[in-house]
Amino acid sequence: MKANHRTLLAVAVLCGICLLTVLSIPRNHTIRSVARVQVETPAGTVPILPWQVRVTYADRTREWRQVRWSGTDREAEAELAARPAGSVYRVQGFLLGDNATEEGYPVEAEVTVVADPRPGPVPVARPLPLRDVRLTGDNRLTGNRDLDVRQLLSLDVTRMLYNYRDTYGLPTEGYARPQGWDSTDTKLKGHGTGHYLSALAFAYAGTDDPALRDSLLVRIRRMVDELRACQERTFVWSDRLGRYVEARDLAPGEELYALKGTWEAFDRYKKDWRSYGYGYLNAIPAQHPVLVEAYRPYNNRDWVWAPYYTIHKQLAGLIDIAENVGDAQVADKALLIARDMGLWVWNRLHYRTFVQEEGTPEERRARPGNRYEMWNMYIAGEVGGMQESLARLSGLVADSEDRARLREAAGFFDAPAFYGPLAQGLDDIRGRHANQHIPMTVGALQLYGLTGEPRYYAVARHFWELVQGRYAYATGGVGNGEMFREPYTQMLSLNTNARTGRQGIVHPDPDINETCCAYNLAKLTKDLNGYDPDDARYMDYYERVLYNQIVGSVHPEHYGVTYQYAVGLNAAKPFGNETPQVSCCGGTGAENHVKYQEAAYFVSDKTLWVALYLPSEAVWAEKGVAWRQDCAWPAESSDITITEGGRFAMKLRVPYWAGRGFEIRLNGRRIARSFVPCSYAEIPERDWKAGDRVSIRMPFGKHISFGPDKMETAVTEGQPQTPFAPMWEGALMYGPLVMASPDITTWEQAEFSLDADLHEIVPCGADAGEGTMGHVYTLSLDGKTFYPDYYLTDHATHYLRLDLH
C-alpha cells in the first residue's frame, strides 16, 4: 500500500489508552486514517505505547493494525525513563505490512511525562469457578477434553508416587519407576506428579458424570493419602531444641557450603529424611532447594535443576484439589499438606535468606541466601508460580498466624533483579528464559493482590504489553529455543536452527513457542482481565492463544502433546510427552485440555461478561442464575439462553476481528446499530427471565497478522540463508483462526503478491472439510489450501512472504 500524505484530517478516536489523530488518503483500500498516539507516563517510566491501532481505509472499512515502535534498545529506554515530569517528546512508529516506507507506514506517538504515578486498580470481576461451567456438544474442545481424561485415567498412579516413597524411606516394591523428567536420574522429579494432581482436579471439576467423578476421586484420594504419609515422616521432635525439627535447622552455618549436589550425596540425603524439616514434601531431598542459597548452578549431574519449580507444581496440585474436589475429607487433607509445605518454605526463607541489591554480583553473594541472586539464576532460580500458590494458600487457611506467614512467604519470591526494570516499563524480557519468567509475572499480580503495592501490578501489566507488542507470534505463543530473543525479531527466529534435509538441502527448523509459555500467558491474561474486564484486548489475546496454540497442542486422535510448537516453514507439530512426567510441557499439557472453559465468563456483583464464545452451560451460584450457550466451535454465531433468571447486566465481547455483519440481538431485537471491535457491548441491568435469548452473529473475515521484522539473509552464523528481497511476513487469519497450509514447503512457494483487500483469498466455508471433530473452515489461495492451525498435525507453513498493493 503506497501512502499519500497530501491531506490531513483530524479525527479523534478513543482506543484503549490512546487518542488518535489521523491522516486521510482517498484511495480504495489504501489507508485513509492512521494513528498519532498521545499518552501520559509517570516520571521514571517508559510509556506504554499501543501495539495495535484502529485504521480506516479509503473504502471506509476498518481494522486493527499492529505497530512497531522505535527506541527499544536498552540505552534508548533508559533515556526515556530519565525524562523529568513536564517533558513532552515523540516516538516514531510504523504500521506493519505497509510499503509506504521500508519500515512500514509511519505513525508518531506524543508522550507527556507526568509527576504522579498511576494508582493501582482494584479487582472488578472474577471468572466463574471451573465447577460451574461445563463444555457441551460434540466438537474439538470436548473431544480433546475426553481424550485427556481417558489418558489421565490410564496412567499408573504408582509411577507418580515412586520417587516420594524412595525419598522418604518407604518401600517401593510394586511401584513402577517413572520416566522422563520425573525419572530417578533427574533432579526435577516431582514436577509431573504436581501437574497430574492439578489435571485430576480440573477434570473432576469439569464433569457432572458421577461415574467419572468416582474414578477420578479414587486416584486423587490415593495420591493425597500417600503424600501425607510421606510428609508425616518429617514430624520429628527434638528434645535438644524443645520443638520439632524445622526447615531452618538443615545445614546451618558453614554446613551449607559443605553440601554437595552429586548423586552420591543425594543418595545419602534420602536416608536422612528426619532432617528435612517439619512439613517438607518433595520427590527429592530437602537439600535440593537449600543448595540454591549457596548459588549452586543448574547442572543435573553435579548440582541442582529447579528446586522451587518442583515445589510449586506440588503446591499447585494440592491447592487445586482443595478448591475443586467435592469430597471434603480429601480436599481438607490436600489443604493440610499444602499448608505444612507452605510453612516449611516460610520457615526456611524467613530464617535463612535476605535481600541485598547493592554491590557487584560477587559482593551480593558474599554470604549465602541473598534472594536477589537466588531468583536471578538461570533455571536453578526458576520458582514457577510460588508467589501465586502461596498467595492462594493464604486465602484458604483458617489460622491467622498461618495466613500471615504464608503471605510473607509469597513476598519472599519478589525478584528485584527482574521486577525492578519491569516496574519502570523497561524491557528486561530480552534474553531471559521465557517460562522461567512468565509465571513470575503471574506471581507479581498475586503479590499486588496481597499487598496493594502498585509496582507489582506495573510489573504484570508492563510484561503483558511488551509480550503483545514485541514478542508474540500470530498464534499467541512466544520464544525461540525457550528464550525471549531480541524484541521485534520473530521472523528472524523463524530462520534459525539449521538442519540438513533430503538432498543435503539446509533448511530452518526453529524451536518456537514452548507450550508451557502459552499455558502461563493465558493464566496471566485471565488474571489481568479481572482488574479491567472491559478491556477486550485481554480476552482477544486469550482467544488467540487458546484457539491457535493450546487447542492444537494435543493430537486429536491419539494422546500426545507438544513441547515446542510448529510455527516455522513446513513445520510439523512434535507430538509426544504422553504423561505429565515426561517434560514440563507434558505437565501443562495434561492440564490444558480439561479447563478450556475457565475464562469463558467473568462476573461482578451486578454484571456478567461473556468473554468467550464456547458451547457451554454455566451457573452463577451467588445469584441463582443459569444459562446455556449454543454454538458450534469455532463459532460464527452463538445463542445464549437464560435457564434460571435474575437481575444483572450482560456485557458481550466484540472481538478485534469483528467486521461487517456483526450484530447482537436480545429476544430478536438488535441492541445497537453498530459495534466497535475490541470492546464489549452492554445490555444494561435488567430482570432476566428463563427463555430470554441473546443471539450473536459474527461472520469471519480475512486479515493478516504481520511479523514485526522482514526476513532477509539470516545474520546468525551457520544458519540457512534466505536470498530473497526483504518482504513482510504475515500469517493469514480467518476470524480468530490462524490459517496454515500443508501445500507450502519452501519460502519461494510462500511468496504472494496480493491486493490489500485480500480478495484473492477465497473462503470455502465451514463445510469445506470434515475435521476430526466437527466441520473445518478452509481458505484457498493460488491453488493452495489453508486450514486452521488447530486442525493440522503434520507439516504446514503459517507465515507467508507478502507484498500487498
Language-model features, listed with the residues they occupy:
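Bacterial Sec-dependent signal peptides at the C-terminal "C-region" and cleavage site
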Residues: L8-H29
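Aromatic (Trp/Tyr) and acidic
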Residues: V11-C15, G120-P210, A247-R274, A286-V325, ...
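Solvent-exposed, low-complexity, repeat-rich "mucin-like" stalks and linkers
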Residues: N28-R62
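Serine/threonine-rich, repeat-prone extracellular segments and beta-strand-based repeat modules
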Residues: D59-T112
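Helix-terminus loop motifs that line ligand-binding clefts
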Residues: A211-R296, Y471-M483
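Hydrophobic, small-residue-rich alpha-helical packing segments that form membrane-like cores
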Residues: L336-P439, Q446-L450
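C-terminal beta-rich recognition modules with glycine/proline-rich loops and embedded aromatic residues
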Residues: A460, M539-N548, S553-T641, V676, ...
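Short strand-turn-strand beta-turns centered on an Asx-Gly dipeptide
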Residues: R665-A672, G735
